[in-house]
């Protein structure tokens, strides 16, 4: 027996095949492009997702004989995208993606609507789904009038696989149409966004069966028996499943292009005023909260570009011993900031530069600035009652031991480095497929990876970094006043 996890990413699709005991058999990848017709626009043609999935499945069939005994499939997808279908289930226009910011006016108006934050549990960001539909209504009324169904990217692949309109709660929580606490579509939120319940897909939990694979696809892929399609998940919930972040206090730190701090919750405790995301998890009776900073390794890669070095060269030059906070302060807002400021206009800055400032000082400042930005997210977690004592560190930035020592100390949280292997969204999706087929309890399947190293905070530097963090916090409003003196 085997299970297939699909990670429908922004730049490509990854298909991961696992055995009946959860061991990775192999994976294949396919890439596709986004279109950016105007500044702030980001779109994709859903037919490219379908083609990528079909090519990946056919390659898996050729490479792995276990694929013929496939029992279940699950899709994890990039969240918030608006795929619009007409009454014939034809795609009306390209999907508007999560990183499309055209609906900023509609997002602000919707966010200011009474009850929206309370019901949805979140600020309405421009990248969320509901403001995109209001933008279509205001700017493409002929397309809005044709909308029969709105599907998120993962739900669109669910439709392709099963012929049914079905989505899971973790993905749907990022639409601003779902009551995150009730785990169901909200009539009030739909009404606020000029949408109807019949335009929404049926909801299931991510680890529950959503349907079965279409017979024609099964025949094309060389599968003789019935295949279950699980509800699936949004990409971050799937990543949490892949790394075993299921119960209260479980969490991970992702040091990628952006920085993500995610913690599982056993209840729904929204804190929208802090720009902290509160979403349904992919398993019943679980939620998760997530703080996002927009420029984590992006900040280091920017410095590497302007100094004509590699990121590894910059961090390697610092050595292995964690140093006290430097005099140079960096605000890592190269593309604005999400948590806790929800400020798309703010930009980064250095302060404290002198004639004696050297390259290593800039590197330390960038690493410290990112660590302080993550501390901002951690502070919002504390305000909502989330207790985090340790985090699993993943992503490209986690390869820097110096950076992990720094972050552990700034956060005063132990960081665990996992053994090399697969524990991302594709694995999480495959695990959800396995649960949907076997009925196993999620805790028996959503296991944590083996930990090869635990990095503890440097107790002797806690006070110094706490003091530096307070300066970092005070810098944001002052720099914003300089950059936007009119308060715009």
Task: Kindly label every feature range from the protein language model.
Residues 8, 46, 87, 101, ...:
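Generic detector of well-ordered alpha-helical packing
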Residues 66-69, 196-199, 387:
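Short loop/turn motifs at secondary-structure junctions
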Residues 1-94, 118, 146, 218-219, ...:
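N-terminal glycine/serine-rich phosphate-binding loop of ATP-dependent small-molecule kinases
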Residues 4-5, 104, 108-123, 134-166, ...:
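Active-site core segments that coordinate phosphate-bearing ligands/cofactors
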Residues 26-30, 201, 453:
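Structural signal for short hydrophobic segments within the conserved structured cores
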Residues 9-12, 69, 76-78, 129, ...:
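Short, basic and Ser/Thr-rich N-terminal targeting/leader segments
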Residues 61-98, 122-127, 154, 158-179, ...:
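Short beta-strand-loop/turn "lid" adjacent to the catalytic site in phosphate-handling enzymes
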């Amino acid at each position: 027996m085997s299970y297939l996890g699909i990670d429908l990413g922004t730049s490509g699709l990854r298909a991961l095949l696992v055995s009946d005991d959860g061991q990775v058999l192999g994976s294949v990848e396919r890439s596709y492009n986004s279109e950016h017709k105007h500044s702030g626009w980001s779109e994709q043609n859903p037919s490219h997702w379908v083609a990528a999935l079909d090519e990946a499945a056919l390659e898996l069939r050729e490479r792995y004989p276990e694929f013929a005994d496939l029992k279940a499939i699950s899709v994890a997808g990039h969240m918030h995208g608006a795929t619009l279908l007409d009454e014939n289930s034809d795609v009306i226009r390209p999907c508007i993606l999560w990183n499309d910011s055209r609906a900023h006016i509609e997002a602000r108006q919707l966010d200011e609507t009474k009850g929206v934050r309370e019901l949805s549990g979140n600020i309405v960001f421009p990248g969320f789904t509901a403001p995109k539909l209001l933008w279509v209504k205001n700017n493409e009324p002929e397309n809005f009038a044709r909308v029969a169904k709105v599907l998120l990217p993962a739900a669109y692949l669910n439709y392709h696989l099963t012929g049914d309109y079905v989505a899971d709660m973790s993905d749907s929580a990022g639409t601003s149409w779902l009551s995150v606490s009730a785990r169901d579509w909200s009539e009030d939120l739909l009404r606020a966004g000029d949408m109807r319940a019949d335009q929404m897909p049926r909801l299931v939990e991510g680890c529950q069966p959503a349907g079965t694979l279409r017979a024609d696809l099964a025949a094309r892929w060389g599968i003789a028996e019935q295949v279950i399609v699980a509800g699936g998940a949004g990409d971050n919930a799937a990543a949490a499943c892949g790394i075993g972040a299921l119960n209260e206090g479980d969490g991970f730190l992702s040091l990628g292009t952006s920085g993500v701090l995610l913690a599982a919750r056993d209840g729904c405790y929204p804190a929208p005023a802090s720009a902290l995301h509160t979403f349904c998890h992919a398993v019943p009776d679980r939620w998760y909260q997530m703080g996002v900073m927009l420029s984590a390794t992006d900040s280091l890669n920017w410095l590497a570009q302007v100094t004509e070095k590699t990121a590894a060269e910059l961090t390697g030059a610092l050595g292995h011993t964690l140093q006290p906070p430097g005099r140079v302060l960096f605000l890592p807002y190269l593309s604005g900031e999400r948590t806790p400021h929800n400020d798309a206009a703010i930009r980064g800055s250095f302060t404290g530069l002198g004639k004696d400032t050297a390259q290593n000082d800039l590197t330390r400042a960038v690493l410290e600035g990112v660590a302080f930005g993550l501390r901002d997210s951690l502070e919002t977690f504390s305000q909502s009652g989330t207790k985090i004592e340790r985090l699993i560190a993943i992503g490209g930035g986690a390869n820097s031991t110096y950076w992990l020592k720094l972050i552990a100390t700034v956060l005063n949280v132990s960081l665990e480095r996992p053994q090399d292997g697969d524990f991302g969204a594709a694995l999480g999706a495959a695990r959800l497929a396995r649960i949907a087929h076997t009925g196993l309890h999620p805790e028996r399947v959503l296991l944590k990876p083996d930990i090869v190293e635990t990095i503890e905070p440097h107790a002797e530097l806690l006070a110094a970094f706490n003091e530096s963090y307070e300066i970092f916090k005070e810098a944001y409003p002052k720099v914003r006043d300089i950059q936007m003196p009119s308060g715009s």
